[in-house]
């Protein structure tokens, strides 16, 4: 049987893919997997700036995402450009249908997306849309749904113990961490100064913490939401 080597990353904002699974994507692309990325929100329009500045920054963010795709070895991403931090104002069915359309087109076996209890409302709704769009009916291509963490969102939420991010899948990114950092730097407007968690030092600290948890130098951690064998 021919192995399905298509992977889909569904992220709320351009930069979430780097923070959540940038090293893992670099590993997978090196192994010959075809990685497609779907960005749901523009990641910018919630800011208190003029429309002209917002439009310019959206274009800059798109260009950065395309640059990142080349660094990590992914396909050129697709942008839905729904309003930033306002996905709760978009009919969920609209987002679901866009994800279903992408799945029909590329037939991925694996999907990476957000953890369902993140603080950010867009992250939560993207997770909900993905889970709905991937109902495991007969002959459905998606066999794995893997949830990633995003600095300054996953760890900032207030949640019950059962909704805490408890990873059960770790990926060694010691050899791909340099690419993760290069990709993060491409989103220069999103990288903050230490001690913000979304700083370069914060990114490395999390990778070291996740790595030491499983006896590795650097790692990314995930929750496997669904695995069908």
Task: Please provide the spans of the model-predicted regions.
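Generic hydrophobic, amphipathic alpha-helix propensity
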Residues: 61-65
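ATP-dependent adenylation/pyrophosphate-handling site
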Residues: 5-14, 18-55
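Short glycine-rich catalytic loops that host catalytic nucleophiles or stabilize transition states
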Residues: 40, 79-83
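Residue-level marker of intrinsically disordered, low-complexity segments enriched
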Residues: 38, 69-70
């Amino acid at each position: 049987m021919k192995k399905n080597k298509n992977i889909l990353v569904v992220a709320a904002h351009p930069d979430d893919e780097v923070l959540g699974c940038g090293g893992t994507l670099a590993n997978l692309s090196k192994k010959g997997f075809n990685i497609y990325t779907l960005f749901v929100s523009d990641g910018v329009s919630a800011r208190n700036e003029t429309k002209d500045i917002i439009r310019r920054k959206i274009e800059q963010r798109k260009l950065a995402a395309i640059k990142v795709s080349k660094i990590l070895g992914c396909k050129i991403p697709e942008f839905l450009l729904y309003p930033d931090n306002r996905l709760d104002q978009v009919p969920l069915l609209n987002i679901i249908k866009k994800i279903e359309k992408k799945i029909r087109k590329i037939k991925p076996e694996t999907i990476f997306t957000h953890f369902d209890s993140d603080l950010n409302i867009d992250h939560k709704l993207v997770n909900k849309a993905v889970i709905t769009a991937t109902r495991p009916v007969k002959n459905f291509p998606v066999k794995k749904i893997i949830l990633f963490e995003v600095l300054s969102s996953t760890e900032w939420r207030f949640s019950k113990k059962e909704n805490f991010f408890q990873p059960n899948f770790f990926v060694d990114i010691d050899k791909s961490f340099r690419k993760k950092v290069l990709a993060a730097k491409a989103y220069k407007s999103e990288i903050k100064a230490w001690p913000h968690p979304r700083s370069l030092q914060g990114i490395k600290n999390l990778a070291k913490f996740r790595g030491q948890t499983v006896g590795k130098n650097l790692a990314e951690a995930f929750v496997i939401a669904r695995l069908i064998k």
